[in-house]
Design a protein with these regions (language model features):
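Hydrophobic/aromatic beta-strand patches that form the interior of the parallel beta-sheet core
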Residues: 54, 82, 100, 134-136, ...
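Metabolite-binding pocket within alpha/beta catalytic cores that recognizes anionic/polar moieties
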Residues: 1-130
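Active-site rim beta-loop-alpha module in soluble metabolic enzymes
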Residues: 115-176
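Flexible, glycine/proline-enriched loop segments at strand-loop-helix junctions
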Residues: 55, 107-116, 153-160, 197-200
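His/Asp/Glu-rich mid-to-C-terminal helical/loop segments that flank catalytic regions of hydrolases
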Residues: 191-229
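Glycine-rich beta-alpha junction loops
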Residues: 16, 88-90, 142, 167, ...
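Zn-dependent metallopeptidase/amidohydrolase metal-coordination segment
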Residues: 166, 172-201
Length: 229
């Protein structure tokens, strides 16, 4: 009789259709089932267990609401949750296409520590040679942040900002203890401010990088299933 525990599901949350499209068209060799429709789309991709990709919609309220609703499903009880998509870089020297691995996510309601940060950094560096990977706190906002406001957020120690990661992870841990992480791709930065995704080189570069991250997410998922020594 097989006494191994059931695989822990993985929930990958992104906000925008273009982010979901990048995930859908990436991940060669990992499978791409079930990513054609809005909302939550399930596919048994990874060795770690079943994987669901959720497009939450834009903004912290939509993200937290969507994640909480999905995690209420018994099939996703205890699911590991990874927030991904695009972000604005806050640190000087960042460029579109750089990667950000959160050590923690923050918003006015609280801070959530991420799991497996070092593994994610190592896997991204290995699978995407030449891409810069930044680590540090990722802060949440309820609006697009531009200009001087970015400097204020940088002064708090944050290295990037987006509207969904903090809400996604806070909503996830409020539904029960679970591994969580956030990996974002810089779409604009202090010296490379973007007006609209997809209209300039920075948006295209970020899209291409996001297409390439799924294998790293699956490796993180597999790793968080391993027993602690």
């Amino acid at each position: 009789m097989d006494a191994r525990p059931a695989p822990r599901p993985l929930l990958i949350a992104c906000a925008l259709g273009i982010e979901r499209l990048a995930l859908r068209t990436g991940g060669r060799g990992a499978g791409r089932r079930g990513l054609g429709r809005p909302g939550a789309e399930a596919g048994h991709w990874a060795a770690g267990g079943p994987v669901t990709v959720l497009r939450t919609g834009m903004g912290p309220k939509a993200a937290e609401r969507s994640v909480a609703r999905l995690l209420a499903d018994p099939a996703l009880a205890g699911a590991a949750v990874l927030a991904t998509g695009f972000c604005a870089g806050l640190a000087p020297g960042m460029h579109p296409g750089d990667l950000v691995v959160a050590e923690e996510t923050r918003d006015p309601r609280g801070t959530v520590r991420c799991v497996g940060t070092e593994l994610l950094v190592g896997e991204l560096a290995r699978s995407l040679p030449g891409r810069t990977v930044h680590t540090g706190p990722v802060t949440g906002s309820d609006h697009v942040v531009r200009g001087p406001e970015r400097s204020g957020l940088r002064a708090t120690g944050a290295i990037a900002v987006d509207m969904e990661s903090a809400a996604t992870l806070l909503g996830a841990v409020r539904e029960g203890a679970r591994p969580v992480a956030a990996v974002r791709v810089v779409v604009d930065a202090p010296e490379h401010e973007l007006v609209r995704i997809g209209t300039v080189r920075g948006g295209i570069s970020a899209f291409r990088v996001l297409r390439s991250v799924l294998p790293t997410f699956f490796e993180w998922h597999r790793s968080v299933l391993l027993p602690r020594r």
